[in-house]
């Protein structure tokens, strides 16, 4: 009986809200908020419209002439729907979700779709639950796609191994939209049952499946899409994008920190295919967030490159909302959320105000909001993810020659640069190692690297995609051990070391990949650490830490390093 009463009470509350919305829309009651004299982007008719915008119960209820308890005159300004990032790993910001929200709200972002595969590789399902709790009721609505590839490959030693059973219960969460980027497209195309069952499980819950298949074409692409993968964010040229568009995929145009594809894909925004395109960042690092912004930066850049402003705005909100079936946002129309971005004009694109569900969150000053409460067990778990014995110089010397990973300037791919049996900084030959840190296996993969430029000391980080073990490069074994030990002592982060002394560091104590500090503090420490790394000789043309973090991802040709040693991606063997 109590269940029926509870249900009846819920219906009654919703009925009262709905009746209030109808009364306000019909002009029989004042709105909670009215944006007076608005010029707004209509994403349905692709035009600028004029009139008041009335909001009640957090929803837009009408356009025309309205009166409200609060009225804001927006004459001479443009009102846009709140922006949506269609694909991002929040962990790439290096800060907590609360700090991320503080960073992007002033830039008009009101919804993001995140894939928490970074923290899931460290903490497994506890990592997913941590992020769900850490994003509850934030003024940026954080929606989730569940990680599809943990670990990224069987070659990785990650903190977890997630099959479809591990993540299945999360599909019932109201903020879970589907299955995140299916990176193992080879497994899909080859009909690997353990891979495809993740897609089948997501479809059984009537959820979306995102793609990740750079350059896939022909029958392989047919097979990938036939399996149920209907988007891709890895297109870097028009040929790849058109191949996928013609077969029904949506294209997420990526403009982030590590990869920037907007310019190459601009023809999509001036074509009949624009409704199949949306914007995403994928990865967004602290300096980018502070210096450039977020989705607003992509919109501004697209307009500067020749996109129709209304088309650019649609790609920043409406198209993503439609793809993810978020039918209550991405437009300014009755029944949609009162998520607004108010700018001066399309030319300057200065954001003056941001509203979330009809509440002013930014008007030159960001409004305060509380951080969500997280289960103490999960907080403790997230701050205790390093299980590594104390390291010594001897751990980095086995007396054998190892393959040399040859860096290529300006590229993320590498080449085979032969073998070496000792570090020779003058010849730009440095030792590189990956230390397993999740299960105290004492597995340490050794190799050498050419092109990094370090002349003295060592650089270490616990951001090493995708398993986030400790990766360290150095001129001496002693400094490599000291740098790696410092990472463990700090429970994660980035360290620049010389002669046993810390020159610069960033503490990332949340799972070893995010900080408890503010974005400004993290960025300041990061820039200082970069300067110290450059001072030790690291080549100025590279990012000392981002470059290092991708050296451990054994899916990018040609040579990579894991906890088992140097791996040849092309031949799929250790060398």
Question: Locations of the language-model features?
Answer:
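Divalent metal-coordination and catalytic microenvironments
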Residues: 38, 58, 76, 87, ...
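Active-site mouth loops of central-metabolism enzymes
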Residues: 85-96, 151-162, 230
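Divalent-metal coordination cores built from histidine and acidic residues
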Residues: 2-24, 101-208, 272, 502-507
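Active-site microenvironment of metallo-dependent hydrolases
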Residues: 1-51, 55-56, 64, 105-107, ...
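Active-site beta-loop-alpha junctions enriched in small/polar residues
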Residues: 89-93, 117-119, 147-152, 182-185, ...
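Structural motif
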Residues: 32-33, 70, 110-112, 140-143, ...
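Histidine/acidic residue-rich metal-binding segments in metalloenzymes
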Residues: 127, 161-180, 187-252, 259-279, ...
């Amino acid at each position: 009986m109590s269940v029926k009463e509870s249900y009846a009470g819920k219906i009654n509350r919703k009925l009262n809200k709905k009746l209030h919305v109808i009364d306000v829309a019909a002009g029989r009651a004042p709105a909670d908020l009215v944006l007076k004299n608005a010029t707004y982007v209509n994403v349905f008719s692709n035009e600028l419209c004029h009139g008041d915008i009335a909001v009640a119960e957090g929803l837009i209820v009408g356009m025309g002439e309205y009166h409200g308890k609060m009225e804001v005159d927006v004459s001479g300004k443009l009102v846009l729907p709140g922006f949506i990032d269609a694909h991002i790993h929040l962990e790439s910001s290096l800060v907590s979700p609360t700090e991320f929200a503080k960073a992007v709200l002033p830039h008009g972002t009101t919804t993001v779709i995140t894939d928490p595969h970074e923290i899931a590789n460290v903490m497994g399902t506890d990592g997913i639950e941590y992020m769900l709790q850490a994003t509850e009721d934030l003024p940026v609505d954080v929606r989730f796609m569940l990680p599809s590839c943990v670990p990224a490959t069987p070659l990785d030693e990650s903190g977890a191994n997630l099959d479809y059973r591990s993540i299945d219960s999360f599909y019932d969460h109201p903020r879970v939209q589907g299955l995140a980027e299916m990176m193992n497209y080879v497994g899909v195309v080859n009909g690997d049952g353990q891979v495809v069952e993740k897609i089948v499980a997501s479809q059984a819950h009537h959820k979306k499946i995102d793609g990740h298949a750079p350059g896939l074409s022909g029958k392989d692409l047919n097979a990938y899409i036939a399996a149920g993968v209907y988007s891709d964010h890895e297109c870097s040229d028009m040929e790849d994008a058109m191949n996928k568009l013609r077969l029904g995929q949506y294209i997420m145009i990526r403009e982030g920190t590590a990869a920037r594809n907007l310019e190459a894909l601009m023809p999509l925004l001036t074509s009949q295919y624009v409704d199949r395109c949306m914007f995403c960042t994928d990865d967004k690092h602290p300096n980018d967030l502070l210096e450039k912004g977020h989705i607003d930066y992509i919109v501004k850049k697209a307009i500067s490159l020749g996109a129709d402003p209304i088309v650019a705005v649609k790609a920043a909100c409406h198209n993503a909302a439609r793809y993810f079936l978020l039918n209550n946002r991405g437009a300014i129309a009755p029944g949609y959320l009162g998520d607004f971005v108010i700018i001066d004009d399309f030319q300057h694109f200065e954001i003056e105000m941001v509203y979330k569900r009809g509440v002013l969150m930014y008007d030159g000053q960001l409004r305060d909001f509380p951080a969500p409460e997280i289960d103490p067990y999960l907080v403790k778990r997230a701050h205790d993810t390093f299980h590594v014995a104390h390291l010594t110089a001897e751990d980095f010397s086995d007396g054998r020659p190892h393959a040399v990973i040859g860096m290529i300037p300006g590229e993320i791919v590498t080449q085979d640069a032969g073998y070496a049996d000792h570090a020779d900084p003058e010849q730009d030959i440095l030792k590189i190692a990956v230390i397993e840190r999740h299960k105290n296996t004492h597995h340490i993969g050794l190799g050498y690297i050419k092109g990094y430029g370090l002349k003295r000391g060592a650089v270490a980080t616990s951001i090493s995609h995708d398993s986030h073990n400790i990766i360290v490069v150095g001129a001496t074994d002693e400094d490599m051990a000291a740098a790696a030990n410092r990472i463990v002592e700090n429970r994660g982060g980035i360290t620049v070391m010389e002669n046993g002394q810390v020159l610069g560091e960033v503490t990332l104590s949340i799972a070893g990949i995010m900080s408890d500090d503010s974005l400004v503090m993290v960025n300041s420490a990061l820039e200082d650490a970069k300067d110290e790394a450059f001072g030790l000789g690291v080549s100025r043309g590279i990012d000392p830490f981002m470059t290092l973090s991708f050296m451990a991802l054994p899916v990018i040709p040609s040579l990579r390093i894991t906890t088992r040693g140097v791996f040849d991606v092309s031949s799929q063997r250790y060398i």
